[in-house]
Amino acid sequence: MGHIGTIIEKNRQAMGFSRKELSENICSEKHIYFIEKGERSPSANMLKQLSERLGVNLFEFYQYIDCQNPFEVKEKMEQFNICRINFDFDSLRQLLTEAENIPDFKSKPWSYEVCFNRIYCRVYGENRLKDSIPELEKILDEIEKNKVDELFIANVHAVLSS
């Protein structure tokens, strides 16, 4: 994908807005066209206004703009978090099986999420911390810090400190 315009376009279409309707009192219809094609970038203020019009926080999508399907990845990530919070290991395992069939989760940094969540299930669901430590340490060694969310790194350290 690679730019926020694609996400704006998909949200606009999902809401049934024309470019003209989306742009009203924000910018020109042509400017929306250029944003959606990746030829222009919206300012932070414009992104806020577009978010309000679309009823979605577009800022949340920046971490997913390089995904083939940012909506699917964002949804799975939210579901992973809910399962971890609720210690729902069966649902988490099911989600991981589904995620392994999504192309984005086969490449970094998203593949780390699948690996980490599998370890999380072993550590907290099966009480197998000891045999999971080497794999957790390996993940930390492999992480490219500029591509992985700091919260992810904190989660790995939290499991290691259990």
Model regions: which residues?
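Short alpha-helical DNA-recognition segment
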Residues: 15-34
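DNA major-groove recognition helix of helix-turn-helix/homeodomain DNA-binding modules
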Residues: 45-60
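Short, charged recognition helix plus adjacent turn
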Residues: 63-88
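"A position-specific structural signal for the A-helix of alpha-solenoid helical repeats
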Residues: 74, 78, 110-121, 152, ...
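Alpha-helical residues within helix-turn-helix
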Residues: 10, 20-21, 49
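Flexible helix-coil transition and linker loops at the boundaries of alpha-helical arrays
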Residues: 64-65, 100-111, 140-153
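Helix-turn-helix repeat elements of alpha-solenoid scaffolds
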Residues: 83-98, 124-141
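A short, Lys/Arg-rich alpha-helix, primarily the initiator
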Residues: 1-14
